[in-house]
Amino acid sequence: MIPICPVVSFTYVPSRLGEDAKMATGNYFGFTHSGAAAAAAAAQYSQQPASGVAYSHPTTVASYTVHQAPVAAHTVTAAYAPAAATVAVARPAPVAVAAAATAAAYGGYPTAHTATDYGYTQRQQEAPPPPPPATTQNYQDSYSYVRSTAPAVAYDSKQYYQQPTATAAAVAAAAQPQPSVAETYYQTAPKAGYSQGATQYTQAQQARQVTAIKPATPSPATTTFSIYPVSSTVQPVAAAATVVPSYTQSATYSTTAVTYSGTSYSGYEAAVYSAASSYYQQQQQQQKQAAAAAAAAAATAAWTGTTFTKKTPFQNKQLKPKQPPKPPQIHYCDVCKISCAGPQVFILCIYHESQCTFTSVYSVLCNSPIDQKDACGKLHLCRLCDVSCTGADAYAAHIRGAKHQKVVKLHTKLGKPIPSTEPNVVSQATSSTAVSASKPTASPSSIGASNCTLNTSSIATTSVKGLSTTGNSSLNSTSNTKVSAVPTNMAAKKTSTPKINFVGGGNKLQSTGNKAEDLKGTDCIKNNPAASAVQIPEVKQDAVSEPVTPASLAALQSDVQPVGHDYVEEVRNDEGKVIRFHCKLCECSFNDPNAKEMHLKGRRHRLQYKKKVNPDLQVEVKPSIRARKIQEEKMRKQMQKEEYWRRREEEERWRMEIRRYEEDMYWRRMEEEQHHWDDRRRMPDGGYPHGPPGPLGLLGVRPGMPPQPQGPAPLRRPDSSDDRYVMTKHATIYPTEEELQAVQKIVSITERALKLVSDSLSEHEKSKNKEGDDKKEGGKDRSLKGVLRVGVLAKGLLLRGDRNVNLVLLCSEKPSKSLLSRIAENLPKQLAVISPEKYDIKCAVSEAAIILNSCVEPKMQVTITLTSPIIREENMREGDVTSGMVKDPPDVLDRQKCLDALAALRHAKWFQARANGLQSCVIIIRILRDLCQRVPTWSDFPSWAMELLVEKAISSASSPQSPGDALRRVFECISSGIILKGNPGLLDPCEKDPFDTLATMTDQQREDITSSAQFALRLLAFRQIHKVLGMDPLPQMNQRFNIHNNRKRRRDSDGVDGFEAEGKKDKKDYDNF
């Protein structure tokens, strides 16, 4: 069936105040509303202008077709569920302006349908209509507002508005439409077979004979639509007909009323079908009478022309039959013998763990042998409740009990067979066989061996819809959730348990318990072996894993021995019959011998026995709720602590990785800087003819530096103007290749010669001590321990023009004048062995050194200072009493010179560790050394203090500094007054005691250097760094600045640069720089 929402076209006549409301409430428009929907419809169709003035204009009336945009998509279901009905209103011309403002009120009809079951009511048959008009009614697959293109009908105002006493026949004759009627019918539920626009509806279906069965008590939310044959005229109601109108879904509506005869529903039983049919006919008769009376009254009142008609508000409330109270839906579980509250609970009852647990426990109890020595040796079984009683009295009490009576009442209501109340007496030895033979089909013992099938679609429908009461949907016995029990080895008599079907009305519970359903369930299991194979292991697993009842625990834990038999007393009546048992330890009573055995094995009795009788009895520990909560809290805190430490470790690991990454990036950038400047220095035609080699010179030592690449320099950020000036100045002050090779040559020759001198002196000492040849070790007989580089040679701070380098010769004993002279005598001989060149050697006793000069250009000078670590050790032990007992040699060298040589060793080691790896540090120190040599003011600045200051200024920066930024930062530090007196000063990090490296400077020297640094900082701020560095300004590399300069000032013809011209105009004297 295709859901169709009819669009009714009517003529709006505003001559009487409240007439349209009367027509709406009088069921004129073809709607049968219920409840709030009727009130809403009446209020909606009754909106009128404030004054009820009759319009009498003989002009042509404009016809408007107003459509309501759909609020939500219409759901296509098996039943008719129109979501909105649009009304085409034809109004006179003067009312057209007011219609635009109230289009929302007249445009649509809101509905609140919650169900999809709509019955078809009957309406009185109207008078035979005239032949259908020439225009064809089209279906359009659209929801938009479209005006009708057909011309409107011109009505005579006098004929309609000025004849209040006209008869019904005259009115009917005048109301006949013209051939071109502005009627357009819309289909609100589009389907695939429709064509767009104004095409014909070509998908026609064969008229089906359907007789709808109305439920006995429909849902309160159900709204019934009355669908009538479509007619283009409005005529008085004729005699009522008792047929249901029919329509064929073709290009046009058929105006002939044809009776529907519905297709047969084989799923319903005859009794239910007949009852529903009779009830439906009664309801149809009542509704036909009420609808006929209401329609006749409304139609007569609409055309009588009276100004006021007395009406009863909301007449269609009388058409709604009073609903009986809805009985609750019953869901009965054949296994547990209980009724469930709803379909979801019923499904959970069948397939939840409690079902399997009940089944497994019952099987264990039935299969486990019970001691035959008990007084009661027989069991009385109740077939209806599946309950076993230990005696006749207990069975009689069960029969009289509320549980049994409730089950009997439920079975009576369901129409299920009720077995006899005679007990089924079974001996305990054969209880397992007797129980399984006498139980119904759905007993728990047979459930364990049965196959449980579950229809997924039916479960989903039940859980989502909650078994909603729909007229055309029902859950069959095969599709509904059920437990079909098929025992495999059961030879006893089998009583078939009736199954349950839920009929669509929601209140009819049909019982179709027969053997055909059992056979159908069996066939379903056979046809679906996968479902049975899946379900059987799950039932068994739950049954084994979750035995929770005390009976199952007592049956499974057979190794627990009962204790305290003597403390259980038998209580007898006057006749001497045992009526109950009393436990003195637990202060409890019970009347079952089996309960006595279970009580003696129980944990409570054993705990009381351990507490009062035998403390050594072992009882299993079962933590209480409080102890369990405490344990869970401890575990939770422990897990939180572990999580906390795990996160801490991850954070530490992340920080280490970030730190390692930053260090790698820093060293990589520094190496790129070094490679860049080395490549620029080696470029023959580059901008920097002799670029610097990086932080270290050729003679410097830096462990771990990779070899220089032969390819092009890596990409780096563009240099600033200050960087270009600093690097250009550094290239000019850096030593040439000849100077570096000369220094390297004379230093290496001197070191090799001193090694030979040490060997010669050691051989001479061995010849004097003949007895100690085998006793003395090789290291102790040497007077000279080694030679080390210090000063600018070790630090890599050589400048162009430097001819002096320093070496330190370590001695095993305190250096003396005799040792100095012997070294000076042997050194020329060893130099002649190593190099053919001639060297001039001088012995400077006052300096505690040997001075070696080369005779070949470039002439280099090497100062070799003798020292020993013993001198500093003795200086540190000045407070010791034994230090004065050791007498120094009479010809020992100057102690201060030796201490200065040891300090130079420490300074070189510190510089290699701290300053060599710092970006731009070595470059800036070379720049400042050149400044100290050029400017007399800076010549008093100690070199060691300057190195400490530069290292601290650059290392304290937040990021690596470029050469220009580093030079500016050093000048800023000095300008702040850090070297002035009264400040902490610069402490020597190589001394154990606090020592200020600026102690040798006077106050005037400190102030002069500070003032000069401030003046240099001002020059840097005004782009006069070339004056600070003592160099000529560089040509501009960016053409944009040259254009700017040309605009500001015309360049001179002689090519003088703008910076030089500005320098000439400056009145300050920069000779100090």
Swiss-Prot record:
Residues 120-139, 419-443, 701-722, 759-781, 1039-1073 are annotated as: Disordered. This is Zinc finger RNA-binding protein. One of its GO terms (molecular function) is DNA binding. Pfam families: DZF_C, DZF_N, zf-met. Residues 702-1072 form the DZF domain. The modification N6-acetyllysine is found at K508, K515. The gene is Zfr. There is a cross-link at K508, K540, K622 (Glycyl lysine isopeptide (Lys-Gly) (interchain with G-Cter in SUMO2)).
